[in-house]
Swiss-Prot record:
<dbReference type="GO" id="GO:0003677">
    <property type="term" value="F:DNA binding"/>
</dbReference>
<dbReference type="GO" id="GO:0008270">
    <property type="term" value="F:zinc ion binding"/>
</dbReference>
<dbReference type="GO" id="GO:0005634">
    <property type="term" value="C:nucleus"/>
</dbReference>
<feature type="zinc finger region" description="C2H2-type 3; degenerate">
    <location>
        <begin position="154"/>
        <end position="170"/>
    </location>
</feature>
<feature type="zinc finger region" description="C2H2-type 2">
    <location>
        <begin position="126"/>
        <end position="148"/>
    </location>
</feature>
<feature type="zinc finger region" description="C2H2-type 1">
    <location>
        <begin position="98"/>
        <end position="120"/>
    </location>
</feature>
<dbReference type="InterPro" id="IPR036236">
    <property type="entry name" value="Znf_C2H2_sf"/>
</dbReference>
<feature type="domain" description="KRAB">
    <location>
        <begin position="1"/>
        <end position="42"/>
    </location>
</feature>
<dbReference type="InterPro" id="IPR001909">
    <property type="entry name" value="KRAB"/>
</dbReference>
<keyword id="KW-0539">Nucleus</keyword>
<keyword id="KW-0238">DNA-binding</keyword>
<dbReference type="InterPro" id="IPR013087">
    <property type="entry name" value="Znf_C2H2_type"/>
</dbReference>
<comment type="similarity">
    <text>Belongs to the krueppel C2H2-type zinc-finger protein family.</text>
</comment>
<keyword id="KW-0863">Zinc-finger</keyword>
<comment type="function">
    <text>May be involved in transcriptional regulation.</text>
</comment>
<keyword id="KW-0805">Transcription regulation</keyword>
<keyword id="KW-0804">Transcription</keyword>
Length: 170
């Protein structure tokens, strides 16, 4: 994604430094509400504002309001770059539909979000109060707590040793 923004800057489109900074940190520069999914991105560039030279090659281009001599822009490659960036936006837009309301993480597939949500709910239910570890099942937590309490409910009839898990009996 950052590379696509760099391509837009190379083409002469102005992108704010804060947006590039967010992309370098691998964060999205915006989060859209469901109603705005197909709308334009407010506060950012608009492709319609970009002008491409009608000549096959332009000898200069403008970057942040300054002319850069010797730069060549082909109309075809500029259109290709824009289409590539727009396809990336479609991917980002699809991913913004599945946002975790608790922590703000983005997921492209609804199933990924569903699995992620379990992390938030299970932390409250299955956390060991002694060491802070989290468990997906309460039965696993109960087994784990025997380590802290020293409880050994399973006894071997042959050697008289005791164990904290039935699976350790052989």
């Amino acid at each position: 994604m950052l590379e696509n923004y760099q391509n837009l800057v190379w083409l002469g489109l102005s992108i704010s430094k804060s947006v590039i900074s967010l992309l370098e940190k691998r964060k999205l520069p915006w989060i859209m509400a469901k109603e705005e999914i197909r709308g334009p991105l407010p506060g950012y560039f608009k492709v319609s504002e970009m002008t491409i030279s009608q000549e096959p090659k332009a000898k200069t281009r403008t970057l942040f309001g300054k002319d850069v001599p010797g730069a060549e822009i082909k109309e075809l490659s500029a259109k290709r770059a824009i289409n590539e960036v727009l396809s990336q936006f479609d991917t980002v837009i699809k991913c913004t539909r599945n946002v975790c309301k608790e922590c703000g993480n983005l997921y492209c597939h609804n199933m990924q979000l569903t699995l992620h949500k379990r992390n938030h709910t299970q932390k409250k239910c299955n956390q060991c109060l002694d060491c802070g570890k989290y468990f997906t099942r309460q039965s696993t937590l109960i087994q784990h707590q025997r380590i802290h309490t020293g409880e050994r409910p399973y006894k071997c009839n042959e050697c008289i040793k005791t164990f904290n898990q039935r699976a350790h009996l052989t």
